[in-house]
């Protein structure tokens, strides 16, 4: 059902307008023209006010209020920030990220860091950030001090990656830790755009997701459910400290793992990389050794190997 014929518009716009006009014909027929004009104006205002509004500003920081905080583990939280109106959306293109800024005690300048929301523009009225707090992480530590009702400065969109359906035949992904967040954004967009969901996206997806311990695997339930529902999405987990009877990878992500699990170098594939800087550096070298085009210092959309 389109937004024009949604239940909300039928009950909140069309029926009240019809009742206004009908009631006027009973009371005084001469007022029908005025009642009709009033109904049109009110209906237009109602329809317009319900239309999703993109709130991000790429040039100026805006304050967003912390609405909720969900503890995932001892050092990972999901922070939910409210948008100004319940119908507002962030307006973030798939593959891009936002900048968070804060004044940190002991720092001479305002600190700015980039994060990718795990929510999307399908989620009106709020956006969610999955953040791991690091001992030396200025913004991640600042987020842990926020209380419900506190504000955070946000600017965006930002980034060179903008995913479009079928931009390549096959996407390989290598993620480490919280580097899974931009990958999840792309994965969900592809699956949402499948033919069975009314789209035309047939992109194959293979993900290598590396972590230290089993408890460090973020969003595992959601990822596993997505893979269960979509045959064209496959995950290979890698752990430094695997449990007994582990059937995934062990140690660091190796060229052999990449060769076995990700698409071979070709003109219609892309490899996405996101994780801690040492891992990203190692994966750049590994992909180049396997015949993929050398990753640039600053990634561009057209690059075969793209690093977030």
Swiss-Prot record:
Binding, FAD: 144-159, 170-207
Keyword Lyase: no
GO cellular-component term (any): mitochondrial outer membrane
BP GO annotations: protein histidyl modification to diphthamide; tRNA wobble base 5-methoxycarbonylmethyl-2-thiouridinylation
Pfam families: FAD_binding_6 (PF00970), NAD_binding_1 (PF00175)
Keywords, in A-Z order: FAD, Flavoprotein, Membrane, Mitochondrion, Mitochondrion outer membrane, NAD, Oxidoreductase, Transferase, Transmembrane, Transmembrane helix
Main location: mitochondrion
Cofactors: FAD
Compartments (UniProt record): Mitochondrion outer membrane
Pathway terms, separated by semicolons: Protein modification; peptidyl-diphthamide biosynthesis
Key word Membrane present: yes
The enzyme's E.C. designation: 1.6.2.2
Catalysed conversion reaction: 2 Fe(III)-[cytochrome b5] + NADH = 2 Fe(II)-[cytochrome b5] + NAD(+) + H(+); 2 Fe(3+)-[Dph3] + NADH = 2 Fe(2+)-[Dph3] + NAD(+) + H(+)
InterPro entries named in the record: CBR-like (IPR001834), Cbr1-like_FAD-bd_dom (IPR008333), FAD-bd_FR_type (IPR017927), Flavoprot_Pyr_Nucl_cyt_Rdtase (IPR001709), FNR_nucleotide-bd (IPR039261), OxRdtase_FAD/NAD-bd (IPR001433), Riboflavin_synthase-like_b-brl (IPR017938)
Segments forming domain FAD-binding FR-type: 59-164
Membrane topology classification: Single-pass membrane protein
A GO term for molecular function: transferase activity
Ranges that cross the membrane: 10-27
Quaternary assembly: Monomer. Component of the 2-(3-amino-3-carboxypropyl)histidine synthase complex composed of DPH1, DPH2, DPH3 and a NADH-dependent reductase, predominantly CBR1.
Biological role stated in the UniProt entry: NADH-dependent reductase for DPH3 and cytochrome b5. Required for the first step of diphthamide biosynthesis, a post-translational modification of histidine which occurs in elongation factor 2. DPH1 and DPH2 transfer a 3-amino-3-carboxypropyl (ACP) group from S-adenosyl-L-methionine (SAM) to a histidine residue, the reaction is assisted by a reduction system comprising DPH3 and a NADH-dependent reductase, predominantly CBR1. By reducing DPH3, also involved in the formation of the tRNA wobble base modification mcm5s 2U (5-methoxycarbonylmethyl-2-thiouridine), mediated by the elongator complex.
The family this protein is said to belong to: Belongs to the flavoprotein pyridine nucleotide cytochrome reductase family.
Name of the featured protein: NADH-cytochrome b5 reductase 1
Gene of this entry: CBR1
